[in-house]
A protein has these predicted regions:
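Protease-domain processing segments flanking chymotrypsin-fold serine proteases, especially trypsin-like
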Residues: 1-42, 54-60, 65
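Short edge-strand/loop segments of extracellular domains
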Residues: 55-65, 111-117, 147-153
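Active-site substrate-binding loop(s) of clan PA
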Residues: 78-84, 100-143
Length: 180
């Protein structure tokens, strides 16, 4: 399993990101995702090995406190058809939930950009999650966030070479962020 975290981040204001969900295996957080509708979550395909039964926790800020949150089972797993384990290409997956999310102040879906809509270089963006706070360190039970800036694709390709795909990825830089 790929280990991801929010490095050099700060704790998010509770419930300020109501679209964020915790994807869990045996009630242990393994990945983050976000609601894109009342019954679909978007996440990374590497979060599921093809056999596990995952659940999604919506409405959470602190994973040790179930107040205002709901646990929902996953009805179906829809990884990108070209995703291959151990490769970063096409690492995206939809989860169809067993029941619709009860939308409220703690659980709302996020708006997705329209097709062809680009994010300008140097745009300030945020990343969020419950991952590790430092490399190989402990995971946070509280939602963390960090600000990053969008990087120029040419600069990113120069730095990452064949590991970067302009059509599938975006590069960011900053003092904190999501690290693999």
């Amino acid at each position: 399993l790929v280990k991801v975290g929010i490095v050099n981040g700060t704790e998010a204001k509770p419930h300020s990101r109501p679209y964020m969900v915790s994807i869990q295996l045996n009630e242990i957080h393994i990945c983050g995702g976000f609601l894109i509708s009342e019954e679909f979550v978007l996440t990374a395909a590497h979060c599921w090995n093809g056999l596990e039964i995952l659940t999604v926790v919506v409405g959470a800020h602190d994973l040790t406190d179930s107040k205002n949150s709901d646990r929902i089972g996953v009805k179906s797993y829809i990884p990108h058809p070209s995703y291959m384990i151990n490769f970063s290409w096409n690492d995206i997956m939809l989860l169809r939930l067993q029941e619709k999310v009860n939308l409220n102040n703690y659980a709302k879906w996020i708006s997705l950009p329209k097709k062809g809509e680009d994010v300008e270089v140097n745009t300030l963006c945020s990343v969020a999650g419950w991952g590790q706070l430092i490399t190989n360190g402990p995971k946070s039970s509280r939602l963390m966030e960090a600000n990053v800036h969008i990087m120029n694709n040419k600069e990113c390709h120069k730095r990452w070479e064949d590991k970067f795909s302009v059509s599938q990825m975006m590069c960011t830089h900053g003092l904190g962020g999501s690290c693999i």
